[in-house]
């Protein structure tokens, strides 16, 4: 089998294609969630706590000296990324919960009695009838 034919078969397997689609959709979903957090959630939240832009939260570890730039820890961006993560994790949790519900197997109905059980039941019933009719 040629290398390219083998690769094509590998790439066209259902699970590989599904994974690729999932990665692409996940990347797009990540952008949507980032925009939701940055543009929709954080501005009102910042307004509620005093008109603060979370992106501006930073701690200067060392100020700029001459040509040496300042060393700054931007913890506001980190807070925003934590919000991103929580929303994405919650959405994935909900999606997995729905998928698990859809894939949940319905309990099988109990099978009826086997042929042997039916036959033995009939024999038992016949023996009971015969014993009832005896004096």
From Swiss-Prot:
Membrane topology qualifier: Multi-pass membrane protein
GO CC entries: plasma membrane
InterPro entries xrefs: Mechanosensitive_channel_CS, MS_channel, MSC/AndL, MscL_channel
Signal peptide per UniProt: none
Sequence intervals crossing the membrane: 10-30, 76-96
Entries under Pfam families matching the protein: MscL (PF01741)
Major localization class: membrane
MF annotations from Gene Ontology: mechanosensitive monoatomic ion channel activity
Key words of the record: Cell inner membrane, Cell membrane, Ion channel, Ion transport, Membrane, Transmembrane, Transmembrane helix, Transport
Compartment(s): Cell inner membrane
Family in the record: Belongs to the MscL family.
Subunit structure: Homopentamer.
Primary role: Channel that opens in response to stretch forces in the membrane lipid bilayer. May participate in the regulation of osmotic pressure changes within the cell.
Protein's name in the database: Large-conductance mechanosensitive channel
Species of origin: Cronobacter sakazakii (strain ATCC BAA-894) (Enterobacter sakazakii)
Gene that this sequence comes from: mscL
């Amino acid at each position: 089998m040629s290398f390219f034919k083998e690769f094509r078969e590998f790439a066209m397997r259902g699970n590989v294609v599904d994974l690729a689609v999932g990665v692409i959709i996940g990347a797009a979903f990540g952008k949507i969630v980032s925009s939701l957090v940055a543009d929709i959630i954080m501005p009102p939240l910042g307004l509620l706590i005093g008109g603060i832009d979370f992106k501006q939260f930073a701690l200067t570890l060392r100020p700029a000296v001459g040509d040496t730039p300042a060393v700054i820890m931007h913890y506001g961006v980190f807070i925003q990324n934590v919000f991103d993560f929580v929303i994405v994790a919650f959405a994935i949790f909900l999606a997995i919960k729905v998928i698990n519900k859809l894939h949940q197997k319905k309990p099988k109905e109990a099978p009826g009695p086997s042929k042997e059980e039916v036959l033995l039941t009939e024999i038992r019933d016949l023996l009971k009838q015969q014993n009832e009719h005896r004096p």
